[in-house]
């Protein structure tokens, strides 16, 4: 059974029979984990083992584990700083900022790979315009060249640990005040003005970025649809103009920014038709079941091949990782850097 185009979430710290049934549906392809799914390192490792044993090829397992306000797993994991901390270090010393970003990318990815997570939806490529509260210090910097530089080094660290990177939120969520979890933001800037926000994505595509997540934001001077449902953005700009050949993941279809596209099956069909390879349905298992049953078309073979490249590689066991000099050095350096509050931001 090949990977399907739907990524689902779980209710708790162990699989229920209903979840087992949903995850073996031919249209299921992945699982996204949240803080509610984490109790301890041992529990998480066992949960991942169960998920991986459900089918072949194994389901993708993802998490939002950026650091700062967005870090799903806590006890036992390194407390990671917000991306803005690397931008601050970069402003003082470019080389140190780059090295810290690379080290944090490796540390985040190595710890997740050690428990069986395939990838994190990171790094954030949005610009720190000082407008968006939901982005805020999740962005590396206000300068697109600096964002691209730091994100490149962060991604290289992830890759060294055996993890593919997913940049978000194309073509840029940093220029709107509204939070797309709560409303449908509208960006009224001209295409020329948006170029600065797109630049980090363009650079990262050239550097070999494996995945991209579009924003549930309308860029009204370009297209009337939110970017995650827009063939203008996903096929015209991202695939054709930027030459992106990796995976396009929708943002969560349960967000308010997706409601304009109809019911959940309609949202999923619209996102896939526009160019997404996989759609996320979170916090509404009954709607996830509807989406799975509503997608009649066979998965796109090209999308299946893209998704297969998102599986993690080279994972060490937790003991092997924490015994390594590289982990001990990276953890000490990153712990000394971090001063951000750790809280759950529902993104």
Curated annotation (Swiss-Prot):
It is found in: Cytoplasm. One of its GO terms (molecular function) is beta-N-acetylhexosaminidase activity. It comes from the Bacteria. It is an enzyme of class 3 (hydrolase). InterPro entries: Beta_hexosaminidase_bac, Glyco_hydro_3_N, Glyco_hydro_3_N_sf, Glycoside_hydrolase_SF, NagZ_Beta-hexosaminidase. Keywords: Cell cycle, Cell division, Cell shape, Cell wall biogenesis/degradation, Cytoplasm, Glycosidase, Hydrolase, Peptidoglycan synthesis. Pathway: Cell wall biogenesis; peptidoglycan recycling. The active site is at residues 181, 251. The record marks 179 as: Important for catalytic activity. It catalyses: Hydrolysis of terminal non-reducing N-acetyl-D-hexosamine residues in N-acetyl-beta-D-hexosaminides. Plays a role in peptidoglycan recycling by cleaving the terminal beta-1,4-linked N-acetylglucosamine (GlcNAc) from peptide-linked peptidoglycan fragments, giving rise to free GlcNAc, anhydro-N-acetylmuramic acid and anhydro-N-acetylmuramic acid-linked peptides. PANTHER family: BETA-HEXOSAMINIDASE, BETA-HEXOSAMINIDASE-RELATED. HAMAP family: NagZ. Belongs to the glycosyl hydrolase 3 family. NagZ subfamily. This is Beta-hexosaminidase. It comes from Thioalkalivibrio sulfidiphilus (strain HL-EbGR7). The lineage of its organism: Bacteria, Pseudomonadati, Pseudomonadota, Gammaproteobacteria, Chromatiales.
């Amino acid at each position: 059974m090949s990977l399907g185009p739907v990524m689902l979430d779980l209710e708790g710290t162990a699989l229920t029979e209903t979840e087992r049934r949903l995850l073996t549906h031919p249209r299921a392809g992945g699982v996204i984990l949240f803080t509610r799914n984490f109790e301890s390192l041992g529990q998480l490792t066992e949960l991942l083992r169960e998920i991986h044993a459900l089918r072949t090829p194994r389901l993708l397992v993802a998490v939002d584990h950026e650091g700062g306000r967005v870090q799903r797993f806590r006890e036992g994991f390194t407390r990671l700083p917000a991306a803005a901390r690397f931008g601050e270090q970069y402003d003082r010393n470019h080389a140190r900022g780059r090295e810290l970003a690379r080290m944090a990318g490796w540390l985040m990815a190595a710890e997740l790979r050690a428990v069986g997570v395939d990838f994190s939806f990171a790094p954030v490529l949005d610009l720190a315009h000082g407008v968006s509260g939901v982005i805020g210090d999740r962005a590396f910097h206000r300068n697109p060249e600096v964002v691209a530089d730091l994100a490149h080094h962060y991604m290289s660290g992830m890759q060294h640990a055996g993890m593919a990177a997913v940049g978000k939120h194309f073509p840029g969520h940093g220029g709107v005040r509204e939070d797309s979890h709560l409303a449908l933001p509208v960006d009224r800037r001209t295409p020329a003005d948006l170029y600065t926000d797109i630049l980090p994505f363009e650079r990262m595509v050239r550097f070999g970025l494996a995945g991209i997540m579009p924003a549930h934001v309308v860029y009204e001077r370009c297209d009337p649809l939110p970017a995650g449902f827009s063939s203008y953005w996903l096929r015209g700009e991202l695939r054709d103009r930027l030459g992106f050949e990796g995976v396009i993941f929708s943002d969560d279809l349960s967000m308010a920014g997706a409601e304009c596209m109809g019911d959940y099956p309609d949202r999923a069909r619209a996102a896939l038709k526009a160019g997404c390879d996989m759609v996320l349905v979170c916090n509404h298992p009954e709607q996830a079941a509807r989406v799975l049953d509503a997608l009649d078309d066979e998965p796109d073979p090209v999308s299946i091949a893209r998704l297969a490249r998102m599986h993690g590689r080279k994972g060490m066991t937790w003991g092997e990782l924490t015994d390594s000099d590289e982990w001990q050095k990276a953890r000490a350096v990153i712990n000394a850097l971090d001063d951000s509050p750790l809280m759950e931001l529902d993104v």
